[in-house]
């Protein structure tokens, strides 16, 4: 069932046909492209949206589809990464093809135990995303997960998280990012720029829900 959901989500997001034309920012263990779509006013500070980092949590692809198609407000600049883990997404698995959890592989207290990888940034996917983030310096980053149905974080930008929660209809929960998480690294690297997690509920999300969350992204992206 999960594989069917992923195939449908990939088709809906247009990745199968559109990915070859998108800018490639890196490659996975198995050689799949990691792509990023740019939209909007390039003179404005960018918002980065990552639809999938755990391959068994594909609902963020529906959000990416909405953000690729919706009209943008003036002065909004988006970078959209459908998946940071294309091998895991193709297999319907949380980890990448090396069995590493890419959201425990960042240089932010990475424990080097379990599935966090042998060392920080040991994986080509996390290494590619780190390089991309350092290059574009996003003013705001949102990473999508499943299935907890909440917005969480604990950084100084709680007002931003609560605003997203209010606009999306999801509850906010104060929660520290785990060791080795991407948002934990980003908050250290760019302390003035919010980076947080949105958890969709389990299973596919409706078009209306994806659109509501996309509108929340745009609202937070307006300067």
Per-segment meaning from a language model:
Residues 27-29, 44-53, 57-68, 72-177, ...:
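Active-site/substrate-binding loop(s) of hydrolase catalytic cores
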Residues 153, 179-223:
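Active-site-adjacent mobile loop/cap segments within catalytic or ligand-binding domains
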Residues 35-44:
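Short beta-strand-to-loop junctions in surface cap/lid or active-site-entrance loops
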Residues 2-35:
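Short glycine- and acidic-rich boundary segments immediately preceding or forming the N-terminal edge
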Residues 33-34, 89-92, 182-188:
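Short, solvent-exposed polar/charged micro-motifs at secondary-structure junctions
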């Amino acid at each position: 069932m999960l594989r069917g959901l992923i195939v449908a989500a990939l088709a809906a997001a247009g990745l199968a046909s559109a990915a070859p034309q998108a800018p490639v920012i890196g490659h996975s263990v198995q050689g799949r492209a990691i792509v990023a779509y740019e939209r909007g006013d390039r003179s404005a500070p960018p918002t980065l949206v990552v639809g999938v980092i755990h391959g068994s949590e594909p609902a963020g692809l529906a959000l990416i589809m909405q953000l690729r198609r919706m009209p943008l407000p003036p002065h909004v600049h988006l970078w959209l990464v459908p998946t940071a883990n294309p091998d895991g997404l193709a297999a319907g698995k949380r980890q990448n093809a090396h069995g590493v959890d890419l959201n425990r592989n960042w240089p932010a207290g990475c424990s080097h135990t379990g599935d966090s990888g042998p060392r920080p940034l040991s994986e080509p996917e996390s290494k590619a995303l780190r390089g991309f983030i350092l290059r574009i310096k996003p003013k705001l980053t949102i990473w999508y997960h499943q299935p907890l149905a909440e917005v969480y974080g604990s950084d100084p930008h709680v007002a931003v998280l609560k605003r997203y929660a209010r606009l999306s209809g999801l509850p906010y929960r104060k929660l520290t990012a785990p060791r080795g998480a991407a948002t934990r690294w980003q908050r250290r690297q760019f302390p003035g720029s919010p980076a947080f997690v949105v958890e969709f509920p389990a299973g596919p999300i409706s078009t209306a829900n994806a659109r509501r969350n996309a509108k929340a992204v745009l609202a937070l992206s307006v300067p």
